[in-house]
């Protein structure tokens, strides 16, 4: 199988990730629940994961909360920052993991910047939304549909100028693009563990600068006499037993990412450029621009879902449809058709793109 669906989850992971998960399952008990060796090893595995995340995201280990996925982290962050009925600025390319929690809170959502790959439009409309009275902002770093890299540093600066706290959704950028919590000044950054960080599914991170409200309540292994959750992070947001094997695997994935420097970003970007150029030669409508990560979408001449299935029958794994982001499709004008999405990973190589283009051309 030629796997080109890294926007959904990483599939080919570094061997160290598999080894770390198995080692944790065989040697670690529950952290914070005992002073014996296996419990201590579990605590060490979890703390090591936080330390590695701190190195990658420019934050302290205690600012790193382990979650089950990026959606989990976004729900905590949004419910911590956004008041029911509050006015919130978002980009025109947000995922349902952002939009549905906002809708559930009855937030007044102001959509700012609907032009693909157009930083001027994004910043102009985002500035207007902030000045119109937004009291919070939530925006993605990279569109999960189109790979559009938003000007998040400039958007963060606008938020700071207006005194508006903000949340960054790093679902499609963590592990590939630089993401720095304290330098950016976000209240929260949410990231999945299983995508660009190359960890197991069922893992994620919430990086915290702001005051966080618990989403779940229960045991933490500390301050058990209290009727409410502890005040200190990360315990305040981690009720119940931590996913120790997941944390160990995520730690190994992040260590691999750190060891690669900018290689992964460069490899993905090379294939996106090649893919866009080759699709254009085939006369296929592809969405490609100046500010693009390792994802590209195109609209075939037939139903997207059927086209993706035909690619699957040829051993090529891609994603088709609305990708849980109808707002992004509405902005790009593809809400009725959806798109076929190709997303590369750390193993991005010419032969993958060549095989994809050959299959598309034959179809």
What are these regions (language model features)?
Residues 1-363:
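Pyridoxal 5′-phosphate
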């Amino acid at each position: 199988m030629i796997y080109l669906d890294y926007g959904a989850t990483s599939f080919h992971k570094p061997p160290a990730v598999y080894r770390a998960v198995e080692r944790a399952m065989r040697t670690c008990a529950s952290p914070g629940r005992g002073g014996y060796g296996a419990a201590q090893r579990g605590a060490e595995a979890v703390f090591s994961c936080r330390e590695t995340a701190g190195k990658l995201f420019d934050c302290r280990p205690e600012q790193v909360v382990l979650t089950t996925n990026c959606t989990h982290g976004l729900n905590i962050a949004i419910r911590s920052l956004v008041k029911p009925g509050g006015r919130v600025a978002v980009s025109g390319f947000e995922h349902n993991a952002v939009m549905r929690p906002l809708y559930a809170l009855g937030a007044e959502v102001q959509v700012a910047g609907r032009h693909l790959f157009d930083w001027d439009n994004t910043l102009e409309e985002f500035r207007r939304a902030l000045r119109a009275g937004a009291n919070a902002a939530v925006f993605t770093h990279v569109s999960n549909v189109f790979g559009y890299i938003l000007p998040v540093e400039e958007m963060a600066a606008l938020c700071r100028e207006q005194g508006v706290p903000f949340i960054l959704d790093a679902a499609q950028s963590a592990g590939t693009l630089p993401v720095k919590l304290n330098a950016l000044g976000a209240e929260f950054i949410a990231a999945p563990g299983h995508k660009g960080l190359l960890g197991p599914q069922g893992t994620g991170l919430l990086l915290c600068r702001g005051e966080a409200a618990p989403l779940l309540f229960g045991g933490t292994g500390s301050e058990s006499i209290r009727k409410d959750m502890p005040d200190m992070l990360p315990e305040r947001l981690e009720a119940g037993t931590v996913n120790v094997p997941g944390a160990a695997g995520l730690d190994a994935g992040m260590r691999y990412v750190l060891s690669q420097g900018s290689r992964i970003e460069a490899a993905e970007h090379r294939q996106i450029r090649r893919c866009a150029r080759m699709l254009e030669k085939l006369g296929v409508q592809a969405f490609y621009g100046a500010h693009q990560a390792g994802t590209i979408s195109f609209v075939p001449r037939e139903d997207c879902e059927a086209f993706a299935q035909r690619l699957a029958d040829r051993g090529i794994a891609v994603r088709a449809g609305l990708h849980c982001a109808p707002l992004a499709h509405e902005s790009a004008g593809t809400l009725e058709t959806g798109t076929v999405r190709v997303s590369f990973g750390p193993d991005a190589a010419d032969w993958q793109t060549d095989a994809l283009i050959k299959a598309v051309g034959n179809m």
